Amino acid sequence: MSDESKPIEEPPIESKPQEEQDTEKESLTNSEESKKRAVEPSTDKKKKRRRRNYDEEDKELEKEEAKEKNAKTENNEEGDDDEDDEDDDYEQGKLEDEEEEEDELLEIDESNIITTGRRTRGKVIDFTKAAEELDKERGVVAEEDEEEEEEEEKENEDDDFKEQVQN
């Protein structure tokens, strides 16, 4: 019972199954048809595509819009009233927005608002003390600069005196 004694049967490579041949023919005919479609102008009117809405609210809105369109086609005079209604609705919405903004501002605690000075992370800074400290630091730096300048002047005077003596 060795593996070598059994011959392995392989299907012939040249023959293709019937299904593959059929799919190739279909793909050729499909590509030919697509070329024909591209060349021939379409006589059918393209439909306007609209996104589908599944919500009940959207259905209600569509019904209302349809009613409005029907009403506009029936009477042009009523269209003027519709415009007035739309203006009123717009103004009403504007007023509601302002009321909401005022309500939001009322919720803010006024004690947390910093009215003067710089914003710090909760730390209260006395700016007069800070200014004095800065002046002191600047004064110390200025004093050091003055001392260095005085030392340089003394060295320059010494150098000048030495030059005079040597001449």
From Swiss-Prot:
Signal peptide: none annotated. Residues 1-116, 131-167 are annotated as: Disordered. InterPro entries: Histone_chaperone_domain_CHZ. Residues 16-44, 60-75, 131-141 have a biased composition (Basic and acidic residues). It comes from the Eukaryota. It holds the Pfam family CHZ. The keyword RNA-binding does not apply. Keywords: Chaperone, Nucleus. SMART domains: CHZ (SM01082). One of its GO terms (biological process) is chromatin remodeling. Forms a chaperone-bound H2A.Z-H2B complex that acts as a source for SWR1 complex-dependent H2A to H2A.Z histone replacement in chromatin. Forms a heterotrimer with H2A.Z-H2B, stabilizing the association of the histone dimer. Also, with a lower affinity, forms a heterotrimer with H2A-H2B. This is Histone H2A.Z-specific chaperone CHZ1. It comes from Candida albicans (strain SC5314 / ATCC MYA-2876) (Yeast).
